[in-house]
UniProtKB/Swiss-Prot annotation:
Domain notes: The RxLR-dEER motif acts to carry the protein into the host cell cytoplasm through binding to cell surface phosphatidylinositol-3-phosphate.
Coiled coil: none
Species lineage: Eukaryota, Sar, Stramenopiles, Oomycota, Peronosporales
Bilayer-spanning residue ranges: none
Keywords, ordered alphabetically: Host cytoplasm, Host nucleus, Secreted, Signal
Family, per entry: Belongs to the RxLR effector family.
Annotated function: Secreted effector that does not produce a statistically significant enhancement of P.infestans colonization of Nicotiana benthamiana leaves.
Recorded superkingdom: Eukaryota
Primary localization class, coarse: secreted
Protein's UniProt name: RxLR effector protein Avr-vnt11
Amino acid sequence: MRVYAAFVVALVSLLATNSAVLAVTTPTKLAKLTAPEFTDNENRQRRLLRKQEGAELGDEERTSTQNLGNSLMRVFSKEATRKYYLDLFKRADFTANLPKLAKKGGPDRLNDALKKLRKAGISEEKFAELKGAAAKYADDWYRIYGKLDPIRA
């Protein structure tokens, strides 16, 4: 009889626990957790925390970190433009790439690249070398694609 009473008490407590869990997780209460207002409030709180963390920095520290980030961006972007335009000259060295470069602007493209490389801060020796390569490329390009080649004419 005691075993039976313990069994009934266990079932009743299990039933009470399940009903309490079900009462907490009703669809309406779950919907409140996924409602846009809840997520908006959560996002607003996160933004507020980020602002407070940023406010802990002084004005000088904040501007110095911004200036550091800006200068790093300038360094990396200069390096990226320099690399891109130097690659143009590497591609122009191969005669197999002449038709591809001709479709994309011909000698003017390399002359524009020279201007941008000069702004990016390339050395004078390298600039003179690349200028000679651009002139040679322009001669070849005008000879072949300007119908001045005696073989093609």
